[in-house]
């Protein structure tokens, strides 16, 4: 996948601060410390565009990134971090729900899971909520490099069983090795109804 340009646009907490709704958008959601920032950086072939942190719950805003002047990635705050107050978790939840249910240019959500962890009730509730609101979802299991290919498949099967979904619905991904990057891009572009990005050399910075 050719990345000609990728840049930070703005951060927001409410609709009045969102960028103009001019390009198709894909949001990225997942538990705190699931590897969301690393996944986005890997997709964009940028090491530090999206700030990574060893402290879960660091992302507290909706962060918008323009890619190839063709689409926008939206980094959502992570969920499930116990040390964040209930009031803050509620605030984040309302902020995310408002964005997902009202943003007309949102084409779908990449829901990020950790391949090392079998999903539970929170993930099933999330999928049910997205389905109820007619939000297309791309499921991605990160940190695949922690397992052999055989073990990856075994974990993928367990995750699919826990979520009650077909095995091939889950993308297996590694930000470290690039495994699954092209396949995930294909799903994203398909969801955004973009044939392909402009061909050329990656403009890495």
Swiss-Prot record:
Q: Which InterPro entries match?
A: G_ENGB_dom, GTP-bd, GTP-bd_ribosome_bio_YsxC, P-loop_NTPase, Small_GTP-bd
Q: Which PROSITE patterns match?
A: G_ENGB
Please indicate if the UniProt record lists Protein biosynthesis as a keyword.
no
Annotated binding of Mg(2+), by residue: 37, 59
Q: Transferase among the record's keywords?
A: no
Q: Which GO terms describe its molecular function?
A: GTP binding; metal ion binding
What UniProt keywords apply to this chain's record, in alphabetical order?
Cell cycle, Cell division, GTP-binding, Magnesium, Metal-binding, Nucleotide-binding, Septation
Which cofactors is this protein said to need? Answer: Mg(2+)
Give the record's GO CC terms. Answer: cytosol
Domain EngB-type G intervals: 22-194
Where does the chain bind GTP? 30-37, 57-61, 75-78, 142-145, 173-175
Function in brief: Necessary for normal cell division and for the maintenance of normal septation.
What PANTHER family does this protein's entry cite?
ENGB-TYPE G DOMAIN-CONTAINING PROTEIN (PTHR11649:SF13), MSS1/TRME-RELATED GTP-BINDING PROTEIN (PTHR11649)
Q: What is this protein called?
A: Probable GTP-binding protein EngB
The organism is Desulfatibacillum aliphaticivorans
């Amino acid at each position: 996948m050719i990345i000609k340009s990728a840049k930070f646009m703005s951060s927001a907490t409410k609709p009045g601060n969102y960028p103009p709704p001019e390009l198709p958008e894909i949001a990225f959601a997942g538990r705190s410390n699931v590897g969301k920032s690393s996944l986005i950086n890997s997709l964009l072939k940028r090491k530090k565009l999206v700030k990574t942190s060893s402290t879960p719950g660091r992302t507290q805003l909706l962060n918008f990134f323009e890619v190839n002047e063709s689409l926008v990635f939206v980094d959502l705050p992570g969920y499930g971090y116990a040390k964040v107050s209930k009031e803050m978790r509620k605030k984040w939840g309302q902020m995310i729900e408002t964005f997902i249910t009202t943003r007309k240019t949102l084409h779908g959500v990449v829901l990020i899971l950790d391949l090392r962890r079998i999903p539970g009730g929170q993930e099933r509730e999330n999928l049910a909520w997205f389905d109820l609101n007619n939000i297309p979802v791309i499921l991605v299991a990160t940190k695949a490099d922690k397992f052999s290919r055989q073990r990856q498949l075994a974990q993928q099967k367990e995750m699919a069983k826990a979520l009650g979904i077909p095995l091939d619905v889950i993308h297996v991904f590694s930000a470290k090795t690039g495994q699954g990057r092209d396949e995930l891009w294909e799903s994203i572009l398909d969801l955004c109804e973009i044939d392909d990005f402009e061909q050329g050399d990656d403009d890495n910075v």
